[in-house]
Regions:
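Hydrophobic residues within beta-strands of alpha/beta enzymes
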Residues: 1-3, 72, 161, 211
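Glycine-enriched alpha-helix->loop->beta-strand junction motifs that scaffold or abut catalytic
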Residues: 66-70, 153-160, 175-181, 206-209
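Active-site glycine- and acidic-residue-rich loops that bind
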Residues: 47-58, 143-148, 152, 160-162, ...
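Conserved, mostly hydrophobic/aromatic
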Residues: 45, 72, 153, 214, ...
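C-terminal cap of metal-dependent C-N hydrolases
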Residues: 248, 260-299
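Short, acidic/turn-prone active-site loops that include or flank metal/cofactor-
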Residues: 164-169, 184-190, 287
């Protein structure tokens, strides 16, 4: 699992001690240490870098140089573009975390502040991407919403288009050679929680290469069967979207992602119980790390 941690510049989306630079660094060091000790699954670190966090530039460079991360994504949650093209959705999101009245600011004041913040420069992002690639780290862009953004991603050296906002952008990203990612919860919900692209529709049209767990890990397995039963996708094709394709995107497909001679025996065995897929066995490096037996159900 690639554990995702965000480096935010402020507390727009709520106060979280996990998003401070000290906590992010501590978690990265902990995950790196766990990977070298006894563990049930493989652990990796995904740094989600908000480009309005100008102080994070030096932190990210240090973490890359110390080989603490295995993926980095450039995120821009500035209102008026990306995930928050619709300012009403932005207002609802901000209010969900803390009402503007409690902050003593009007929504317009908050909007102006976040639309005019200093950002990391193109040169800095390119430098981070180059340093990442030198250390065999995959680079992603987040919430791509225009074809122009994709062109910029190409200039920066981005590998992955993570959560493209529209199917047009997802299709273009796929055709340009980016790995395109959608969230599995999107499939279970029947669409984006932010009113953006439908993952199921994009998969049917061949615009999505990878499904990720996003904010609900259990959605990964369930979504594969929903796409088969409800939308007629083949199970092998869907499994590739959560195994082989992600492994290729992360540059680890030599050892992971498919059942082939010479690769690591990392396997998940599932069964159907009461109409829902359930995990019964997990094997890591050929060793069983989890086995679950459901009462009254023979496997």
């Amino acid at each position: 699992i690639y554990h995702s941690f965000s480096l935010y510049s402020d507390e727009l989306l709520g106060k979280s001690p996990l998003r401070t630079k000290e906590s992010v660094l501590e978690m990265a060091e902990l995950i790196a240490d766990i990977q070298n000790r006894s563990h049930l699954i493989h652990h990796r670190f995904h740094l989600r870098l908000e480009i309005d966090n100008v102080d994070a530039f030096a932190i990210a460079k240090d973490m890359i140089a110390r080989k603490l991360i295995q993926e980095i994504s450039f995120m821009d949650h500035t209102p008026g573009q990306g995930q928050y093209r619709d300012l009403e959705i932005y207002r609802e999101t901000v209010d969900k975390y803390h009402g503007m009245e409690n902050e003593g600011k009007t929504f317009e004041e908050v909007l102006e502040h976040h639309q005019n913040k200093k950002m990391l420069s193109i040169a800095q992002l390119r430098e981070l991407a180059e340093l990442a690639h030198q250390n065999h780290i995959t680079v992603a862009s987040h919430d791509d919403d225009t074809l122009e953004k994709l062109q910029l991603n190409r200039q920066l050296g981005v590998d992955i288009s993570e959560f493209p906002i529209t199917e047009e952008v997802a299709k273009a990203a796929h055709e340009m050679g980016f790995y395109t990612i959608a969230g599995a919860p999107n499939i279970l919900l029947g669409g984006s929680h932010s009113g953006n692209m439908s993952a199921a529709q994009a998969i049917q049209n061949g615009s999505v290469d990878i499904l990720c767990s996003d904010y609900f890990p259990q959605a990964l397995l369930h979504s594969l069967f929903v796409m088969r039963e409800k939308y007629g996708q083949t199970l092998p094709d869907m499994v590739n979207k959560v195994s082989l394709n992600p492994a290729k995107a992360m540059g680890i497909d030599k050892d992971y992602g498919s059942i082939e001679p010479g690769k690591k025996a990392d396997l998940v065995i599932a069964d159907i119980l009461d109409g829902y897929p359930v995990v019964t066995h997990v094997l890591v490096d050929g060793q069983t790390t989890s086995r679950v037996e459901y009462r009254g159900h023979s496997i």
